[in-house]
């Protein structure tokens, strides 16, 4: 039944009218203004998914643009490949489309909500927890002449195990010298429903140990996979964003550089 439902949704998605970004001219050098224009919570405006809180609390977006621009500015005019994991309707993909004028963008999600199209955008249905879907993804990028990515951004489920599994799997598709980004990597510490593995060290601690080249015990990653990450990670930078909920800053972003 699930396969039939997916087949139906795929059919509907293919024939659904989409917004053609190739026909939209937006002149902006500011990634934050693009984030705000397309209303993604990566921007600074009050458009985050945390905005609609019952007590009327106003919550700003994450304000990640300043960090993205810091690390991505040298890639802005280059022909690069970008992979986004977890794109929903595609607001951030549309923003990156305008910011990276020559980039080819690959967007994956487990939902068929993506509403944009372009000659430079490739949407692919993929549930990253499904071995079958990951195999299809592997074949898909293989058919695209063995695509590897200059930038990979994980803004997916934010579930603890998924964050680590995505890092372990998709890091292999990152080019030498590329950047792997994890948005909201501390969410499992802030929201208990995202913490699906009991007694595991936090993502924050995982990143710290990877940065220090220290092997650690994990219920998710094998020692060989941890060694592989340590061997290939050059440096890690982490930052706090602007999203405050109930007096707590819940915005965290990590930039992981792969060795050349």
Question: Across the structure, where does each feature detected by a protein language model lie?
Answer:
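A short alpha-helical cap/connector motif
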Residues: 1-153, 157-181, 186-260
């Amino acid at each position: 039944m699930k396969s039939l439902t997916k087949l139906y949704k795929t059919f509907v998605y293919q024939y659904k009218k989409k917004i053609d970004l190739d026909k939209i001219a937006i002149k902006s050098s500011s990634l934050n203004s693009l984030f705000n224009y397309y209303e993604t919570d990566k921007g600074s405006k009050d458009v985050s998914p945390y905005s609609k809180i019952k007590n009327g609390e106003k919550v700003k977006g994450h304000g990640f643009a300043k960090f993205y621009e810091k690390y991505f500015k040298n890639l802005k005019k280059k022909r690069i490949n970008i992979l986004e994991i977890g794109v929903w309707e595609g607001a951030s993909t549309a923003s990156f489309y305008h910011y990276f004028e020559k980039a080819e963008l690959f967007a994956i999600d487990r939902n068929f909500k993506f509403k944009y199209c372009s000659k430079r955008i490739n949407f692919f249905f993929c549930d990253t927890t499904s071995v079958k879907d990951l195999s299809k993804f592997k074949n898909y990028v293989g058919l695209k002449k063995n695509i590897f990515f200059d930038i990979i951004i994980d803004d997916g489920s934010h579930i603890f195990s998924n964050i680590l599994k995505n890092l372990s799997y998709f890091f292999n598709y990152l080019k030498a010298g590329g950047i792997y980004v994890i948005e909201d990597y501390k969410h499992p510490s802030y929201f208990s429903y995202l913490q699906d593995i009991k007694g595991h060290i936090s993502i924050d601690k995982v990143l710290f140990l990877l940065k220090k080249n220290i092997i650690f015990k994990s219920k998710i990653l094998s020692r060989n996979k941890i060694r592989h990450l340590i061997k290939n990670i050059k440096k890690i930078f982490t930052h706090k964003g602007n999203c405050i909920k109930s007096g707590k800053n819940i915005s965290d972003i990590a930039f992981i550089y792969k060795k050349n």
